[in-house]
Amino acid sequence: MATLERKLVEMLKAPVEALGHQLWGLEYIQAGKHSILRLYIDNEKGIFIEDCAEASRQVSAVLDVEDPITSEYTLEVSSPGVERLLFTAEQYKAYIGETVKVQLTMPVAGSRNLKGTVTGVDGQMLNLSVDGNELIVALDNIRKGNLIAKF
């Protein structure tokens, strides 16, 4: 996770939790005037559109005061969804036995894109079973990871 994203998580975690939700994670996608700050919030009871709107108002107020992003951007707040992005070791641990897809910064076993079953998490290392092979991936090598839904 980039330095700005870490700073944003620290800044926005408390306002989201004050609403009774968990800040599941966030993405900051830089694209000039079309940059996006996307927050994912979660709750044991599920997230509804009203929850997203309320969180957006709270978070906007904090961002207006703190002003951590100097360029223009659009704020989006949503639930993580079924094929949720995974941001932390704890989140990967919660899905041991489930299938995930990860995009890597540096290749592992000759690939930057892996799809496999989470078999464990040891500190900041993710254990994945990919096509019957056990691979170990450093969490800081994961550019993007998400759960794959089973239907």
From Swiss-Prot:
Gene3D superfamilies xrefs: Ribosome maturation factor RimP, C-terminal domain (2.30.30.180), RimP-like superfamily, N-terminal (3.30.300.70)
GO cellular component, one term: cytosol
Keywords, sorted A to Z: Cytoplasm, Ribosome biogenesis
Compartments in which it is found: Cytoplasm
InterPro entries per UniProt: Ribosome_maturation_RimP, RimP_C, RimP_C_sf, RimP_N, RimP_N_sf
Keyword Cytoplasm: yes
UniProt KW Cytoplasm keyword: yes
Domain of life: Bacteria
Alphabetical GO biological process terms: ribosomal small subunit assembly; translation
Pfam families reported for this sequence: DUF150_C, RimP_N
Membership in a protein family: Belongs to the RimP family.
NCBIfam families documented for this protein: PRK00092.1-1
Function as written in the Swiss-Prot or TrEMBL entry: Required for maturation of 30S ribosomal subunits.
Protein name, as recorded: Ribosome maturation factor RimP
Encoding gene, per UniProt annotation: rimP
